[in-house]
């Protein structure tokens, strides 16, 4: 684990002391090396799949998320260059330092060996993200979005802190492996339902579950490109990772507590998918689509079957790659047309034909075209939900149809139709942008060929 963490920490002095003309090149090249090195964690050597020491461990659940975090850092750095073009060198350094410090916190969170350490790092990720949104966002509403993001996440996670202190007092330890391997770790009492709610609330807000999702579209729409990418790909997955870790400990005592939340998650998927159909703002549409996909992950995690766990883990990785690609594509349009309104940026297929190909591939991946990893994860979740209740098949089937409709609606709105007059003077695309798209799509294609790498601990 340290072979990834220490080089990432060393990015901080590299960014601080590089000359201004070498700063982007050094940080991009070095972070690409780190992401290549992180691929080694996918190869679990021991029988249990645990690379373990006293502070950090990786297993088949955390490894894919670690690799995803490392993989997206160079892409975020490359994607931000145009956005920061007119900023001073000091501000550029500050931006990159915030991104790298966020990356360090995420790497430590996904490999934390104790729940309290995970909680502290979970909260630490708030600070750099908030600064990135509030300082480098696009519109003045960014301060409002930052406040929503901060208070939703903070208020949701305070009960978790109380629950962890209570569990520490009862069990004497918050070690993830120890609690996972202990049969029935928590005593059965009337307060267990409250304990379950306290533990889950932080993660359900972070996912976010429908009903607690109001902070997400605001944060996504106002964040700069790197903020949107890290938020969609990794910060939402902190919630899913937390649920998958803690649900095993809470499992025997409060199985009934999960039922209303499974129903809310499946209903929320339909609602947010329907909201996508009437969006005019491109980034807002992609943000609501994230809420819909995360509803699938919540439902699959709470059903607690091996297929559900595998589907949830695969969906988190597939969604991380697909939604960041869509946000990056939306940003290429925004950089040229200075608008996110889909009516104003239609007909771009004529001007940017290669970018149109990336739009097509990203939209098809988002709707779960066979044989992509998105479809594999969706099928696993549908099977596990069907085993829980036959009626969920209606809701999940309807959600799949609506997802296909809004993905194609997004594609046709942006790429087809009559061009607007201000689209005629659009700048051509850069090789850098095409490389970012290729590096999003390449893992999706490779994981389609070998999905067992990201199916998690239940495989």
Swiss-Prot record:
Its EC number is 7.1.1.2. Keywords: Electron transport, Membrane, Mitochondrion, NAD, Respiratory chain, Translocase, Transmembrane, Transmembrane helix, Transport, Ubiquinone. It catalyses: a ubiquinone + NADH + 5 H(+)(in) = a ubiquinol + NAD(+) + 4 H(+)(out). The chain crosses the membrane at residues 22-42, 65-85, 96-116, 117-137, 146-166, 194-214, 230-250, 256-276, 284-303, 308-330, 350-370, 391-411, 435-455. GO terms for molecular function: NADH dehydrogenase (ubiquinone) activity; ubiquinone binding. One of its GO terms (biological process) is ATP synthesis coupled electron transport. Coiled coil: none annotated. Pfam families: Oxidored_q5_N, Proton_antipo_M. GO terms for cellular component: mitochondrial membrane. The keyword Disulfide bond does not apply. It is found in: Mitochondrion membrane. It is a multi-pass membrane protein. NCBIfam families: NDH_I_M. Core subunit of the mitochondrial membrane respiratory chain NADH dehydrogenase (Complex I) that is believed to belong to the minimal assembly required for catalysis. Complex I functions in the transfer of electrons from NADH to the respiratory chain. The immediate electron acceptor for the enzyme is believed to be ubiquinone. Belongs to the complex I subunit 4 family. This is NADH-ubiquinone oxidoreductase chain 4. It comes from Tachyglossus aculeatus aculeatus (Southeast Australian short-beaked echidna).
């Amino acid at each position: 684990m340290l072979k990834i963490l220490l080089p990432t920490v060393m990015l901080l002095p590299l960014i601080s002391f590089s000359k201004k003309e070498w700063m982007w090149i050094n940080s991009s090249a070095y972070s690409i090396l780190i992401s290549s090195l992180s691929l080694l964690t996918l190869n679990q050597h021991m029988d249990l799949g645990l690379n373990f020491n006293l502070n950090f461990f990786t297993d088949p659940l955390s490894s894919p998320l670690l690799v995803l975090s490392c993989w997206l850092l160079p892409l975020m750095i490359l994607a931000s260059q145009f956005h920061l073009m007119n900023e001073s060198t000091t501000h550029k350094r500050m931006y990159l330092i915030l991104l790298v410090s966020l990356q360090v916190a995420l790497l430590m969170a996904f490999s934390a060996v104790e729940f309290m350490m995970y909680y502290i790092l979970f909260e630490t990720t708030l600070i750099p993200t908030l600064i990135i949104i509030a300082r480098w966002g696009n519109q003045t509403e960014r301060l409002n979005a930052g406040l929503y993001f901060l208070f939703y996440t903070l208020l949701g996670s305070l009960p978790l802190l109380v629950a962890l202190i209570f569990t520490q007092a009862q069990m004497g330890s918050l070690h993830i492996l120890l609690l996972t391997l202990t049969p029935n770790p928590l005593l059965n009492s009337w307060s267990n339902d409250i304990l379950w709610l306290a533990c889950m609330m932080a993660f359900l807000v972070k996912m976010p579950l429908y009903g607690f999702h109001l902070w997400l579209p605001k944060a996504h729409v106002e964040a700069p490109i790197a903020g949107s990418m890290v938020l969609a790909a990794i910060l939402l997955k902190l919630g899913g990772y937390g649920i998958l870790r803690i649900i095993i400990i809470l499992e025997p005592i409060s199985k009934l507590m999960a039922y209303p939340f499974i129903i809310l998650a499946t209903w929320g998927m339909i609602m947010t998918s329907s909201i996508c159909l009437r969006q005019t703002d491109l980034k807002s549409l992609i943000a609501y689509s994230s809420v819909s996909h995360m509803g699938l992950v919540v439902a699959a995690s709470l059903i607690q079957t091996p297929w559900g766990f595998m589907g949830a883990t695969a969906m988190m990785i597939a969604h991380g790659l697909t939604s960041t690609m869509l946000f990056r594509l939306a940003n290429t349009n925004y950089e040229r047309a200075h608008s996110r309104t889909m009516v104003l940026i239609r007909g771009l297929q004529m001007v940017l034909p290669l970018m149109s190909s990336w739009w097509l591939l990203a939209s098809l991946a988002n709707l779960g075209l066979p044989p992509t990893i998105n479809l594999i994860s969706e099928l696993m979740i549908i099977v596990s939900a069907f085993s829980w209740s036959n009626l969920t098949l209606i809701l999940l089937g309807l959600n799949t149809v609506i997802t296909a409709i809004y993905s194609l609606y997004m594609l046709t709105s942006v790429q087809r139709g009559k061009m607007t007059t201000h689209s005629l003077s659009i700048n051509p695309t850069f090789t850098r942008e095409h490389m970012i798209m290729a590096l999003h799509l390449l893992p999706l294609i490779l994981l389609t060929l070998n999905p067992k790498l990201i199916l998690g601990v239940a495989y």
